[in-house]
């Protein structure tokens, strides 16, 4: 099933607005939720293991180029265990707040064309799941196709 691209764009604009400011694809937040760091439009993170596959997919050269100071450690954080990754990224923070150099580099990484493409792949996959759930619910309720509003509800 294909989801209307304008609906996906709306979901990608609305959902991050609850947790991010500015370009959601470049969002980077500290350990406010116990997940180490949370990055990107849908706040993928180290603690749940959702950020690591994205970092590995873009490759070490992209990470090192975008993160000249912290890139090698970011690669290590995403290549090892979740516990080791949490330990590394928590070292870049004061309490639950990212230090400015780490935040700037994470934002740079998340904003690279390769990482934007990785984020979009995952947004599109989530949109397909959301549309399936919305369609199932709508069909069971009254036999109609889901509305955009219903799709957005299931996306978030």
PLM region descriptions:
Residues 1-156:
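Cell-wall polysaccharide-cleaving catalytic domain and substrate-binding groove, primarily
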